[in-house]
A protein has these predicted regions:
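N-terminal topogenic module of multi-pass integral membrane proteins
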Residues: 1-60, 181-182, 191-196
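Helix-coil boundary and interhelical linker segments in multi-pass alpha-helical membrane proteins
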Residues: 24-34, 78-92, 133-148, 193-197
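C-terminal ends of transmembrane helices
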Residues: 26, 48-61, 103-116, 162-173
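Structural signature of hydrophobic alpha-helical transmembrane segments
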Residues: 32-44, 66, 86-98, 144-157
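Hydrophobic/aromatic-rich structural module bridging two neighboring secondary-structure elements via a short loop
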Residues: 51-90
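Cytoplasmic-side transmembrane-helix entry/capping segments in multi-pass membrane proteins
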Residues: 60-72, 91-96, 116-125, 175-183
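Membrane-proximal helix-loop-helix units in multi-pass membrane proteins
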Residues: 80-142
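C-terminal transmembrane-bundle signature of multipass membrane proteins
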Residues: 153-197
Length: 197
């Protein structure tokens, strides 16, 4: 597996610092549930950046990484839905909880194709929510235009997740080396878009 370069380490360090910054400053005016959800999402991004920085890309081989990384899109999407779609709060929170539970169960059971389908479904719905909701709200004028950057960040993290998923399935879209080369920059760009939005 590709070793971390100095540039990779610098990008991951800035990613971790940016995630820590967002956790420390919080989200202005957010209620308790969205604040908890965003803090969880950024906390897992902080942890991911630090683990990659310390252990290198080898830590991506751990099955636990798949389970823990599921918290990122689920937490961020729960925060967005709770904050901007009040009628969907409970149904979406139930989906997120059940989806996370299914990802854990299918990974523990080693369910092969079932685990992959479950992961793709849960990540897909959460990822589309993070990507689409901020863009829609910005286009409708419900929020400041800059909030669209959150959607762009959602698209970037979704792209990174898909690249890693296909790599893990043994069917990478790009060469494994190329995926690992772009991953640190993709994480930093994602977090930059989230924080700026």
């Amino acid at each position: 597996m590709k070793q971390l370069s100095v540039i990779d380490r610098i990008l991951l360090l800035f990613t971790a610092i940016l995630a820590a910054y967002q956790i420390a400053v919080g989200i202005d005016g957010a209620d308790a549930v969205p604040l908890w959800a965003y803090t969880t999402g950024f906390g897992v991004l902080l942890l991911a950046g630090l683990l990659l920085l310390i252990f290198g890309f080898d830590c991506l081989k751990s099955p636990l990484v798949v389970v823990v990384s599921t918290l990122i899109p689920l937490a961020l999407s729960v925060g967005l839905v709770w904050e901007y779609l009040p009628a969907w709060r409970v149904p979406y929170a139930l989906f997120a909880g059940a989806g996370f539970g299914l990802v854990v169960l299918t990974r523990l059971a080693g369910a092969g194709r079932g685990a992959t389908i479950t992961l793709a479904l849960v990540h897909g719905v959460a990822g589309l929510t993070i990507f689409g909701l901020p863009l829609l709200l910005s286009l409708r004028g419900d929020v400041a235009p800059g909030f669209a950057l959150v959607g762009i960040g959602g698209g970037l993290i979704g792209l990174g997740g898909l690249l890693l998923l296909f790599l893990k399935l043994g069917r990478p879209v790009l060469s494994p080396r190329m995926i690992l080369t772009v991953l640190p920059a993709l994480l930093l760009l994602t977090l930059s878009a989230f924080v700026a939005g």
